[in-house]
């Protein structure tokens, strides 16, 4: 596979002004199945398999996330592979990674953006693609947790308490998540909360820029625009969830 990687790099790389194309999820799956050959700096990671023997994964609008494991340490990671181009994504994630590197909190996980990290044999003109590496968060989304525990008054009271503590902590930070919603909040097995999906995050280095998203409709202020991009953009969502 590495020979094919070198061959394609020499013979088929074309210069283009068009938006970068990305592989299909099925093509990423095939690449991850042979992770040791197709990953560069992360070649020591192996995919965690589901009950059907396939790489464990979940997908969203712009990416697919694989559960990977370092067999030397036993630690699991989330490897995010992109399926669509998003303008400014690389620089944004570099800035986010720099901001979060020294944040010591269970509410946030560190992120690492790696350019040209995964080789994928696909119909795209490129054959090497970026990935985002994050700690794997065990648990379930807050939306799922509420659906399963809404009749348990104690569980709901503790969830409300922990959410309000997280909200107070987040509002004291110089950054903002950018897309607060129950689907982007993980409830760990011990009940503690962790924010995931940082695509819309604001960090101080982005001051003066436009937001890449205005959040999710049901949890975003109706008057918010891409020009509203600072450390206060989570206020409406946090208040809406806290009061519901």
Regions found by a protein language model. Give the residues of each.
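Juxta-kinase regulatory segment immediately upstream of eukaryotic protein kinase catalytic domains
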Residues: 2-56, 91
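ATP-binding glycine-rich loop module of kinase domains
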Residues: 53-55, 61-112
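Activation of the activation-loop gatekeeper triad in protein kinase-fold domains
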Residues: 197-202
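Conserved end of the kinase activation segment
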Residues: 223-232
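Conserved activation segment of eukaryotic-like protein kinases, specifically the C-terminal portion
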Residues: 208-223
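Catalytic-loop of the protein kinase fold
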Residues: 167, 171-183, 187-188
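Conserved structural core of kinase catalytic domains
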Residues: 109-156
């Amino acid at each position: 596979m590495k020979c094919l990687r070198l061959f394609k790099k020499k013979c088929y790389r074309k210069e283009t002004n068009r938006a970068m194309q990305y592989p299909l999820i099925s093509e990423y799956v095939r690449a991850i199945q042979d992770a040791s050959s197709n990953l560069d700096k992360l070649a020591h990671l192996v995919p965690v398999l589901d009950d059907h023997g396939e790489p464990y994964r979940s997908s969203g609008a712009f990416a697919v996330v694989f559960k990977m494991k370092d067999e030397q340490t036993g630690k699991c990671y989330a490897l995010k592979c992109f399926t669509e181009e998003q303008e400014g994504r690389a620089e944004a994630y570099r800035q986010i990674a720099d901001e979060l590197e020294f944040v010591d909190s269970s509410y946030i996980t560190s992120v690492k953006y790696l350019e040209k990290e995964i080789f994928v044999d696909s119909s795209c003109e490129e054959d090497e693609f970026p990935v985002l590496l994050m700690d794997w968060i065990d648990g379930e989304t807050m939306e799922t947790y509420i659906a399963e525990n809404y009749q348990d008054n104690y569980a709901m009271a503790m969830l409300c308490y922990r959410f309000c503590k997280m909200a107070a902590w987040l509002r004291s930070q110089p950054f903002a998540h950018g897309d607060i919603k129950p689907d982007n909040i993980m409830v760990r097995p011990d009940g503690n909360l962790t924010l995931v999906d940082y695509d819309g995050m604001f960090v101080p280095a982005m001051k003066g820029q436009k937001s890449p998203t205005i959040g999710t409709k049901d949890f975003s202020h109706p008057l918010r625009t891409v020009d509203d991009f600072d450390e206060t953009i989570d206020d409406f969502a946090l208040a809406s969830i806290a009061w519901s």
